[in-house]
Amino acid sequence: MATPSLRGRLARFGNPRKPVLKPNKPLILANRVGERRREKGEATCITEMSVMMACWKQNEFRDDACRKEIQGFLDCAARAQEARKMRSIQETLGESGSLLPNKLNKLLQRFPNKPYLS
């Protein structure tokens, strides 16, 4: 285990409650947060799409010969769309456990921090 440097030991020796690190900006919360990027969702229904395209290739791109595969792909796409819709509803209702950035910015604008220490 490394021992602290002489400079750090001397800084703590004079006043043990004084922090050793000196920030270059005051430690005050900002009045807004940055917009986070939405996570990219994973691709859905890849297997159904590949089965449908393989069927099209075998049957010279005739839809009537591949009705079962096309219907399977459309059903999977509809289920994925419903899942995305339910996830977005849960996020807007705040069931995810954290506030969205735009709601947090509105709260921070209503109760701004002082730009100075009092």
UniProtKB/Swiss-Prot annotation:
It holds the Pfam family CHCH. A motif (Cx9C motif 2) lies at residues 66-76. GO terms for molecular function: RNA binding. GO terms for cellular component: cytosol; fibrillar center; mitochondrial inner membrane; mitochondrial small ribosomal subunit; mitochondrion; nucleoplasm. It comes from the Eukaryota. Keywords: Disulfide bond, Mitochondrion, Nucleus, Ribonucleoprotein, Ribosomal protein. A motif (Cx9C motif 1) lies at residues 45-55. One of its GO terms (biological process) is mitochondrial translation. It is found in: Mitochondrion; Nucleus. SUPFAM superfamilies: Cysteine alpha-hairpin motif. Transmembrane segments: none annotated. Residues 42-84 form the CHCH domain. Its main location: mitochondrion. Component of the mitochondrial small ribosomal subunit (mt-SSU). Mature mammalian 55S mitochondrial ribosomes consist of a small (28S) and a large (39S) subunit. The 28S small subunit contains a 12S ribosomal RNA (12S mt-rRNA) and 30 different proteins. The 39S large subunit contains a 16S rRNA (16S mt-rRNA), a copy of mitochondrial valine transfer RNA (mt-tRNA(Val)), which plays an integral structural role, and 52 different proteins. Belongs to the mitochondrion-specific ribosomal protein mS37 family. This is Small ribosomal subunit protein mS37. It comes from Homo sapiens (Human). The lineage of its organism: Eukaryota, Metazoa, Chordata, Craniata, Vertebrata.
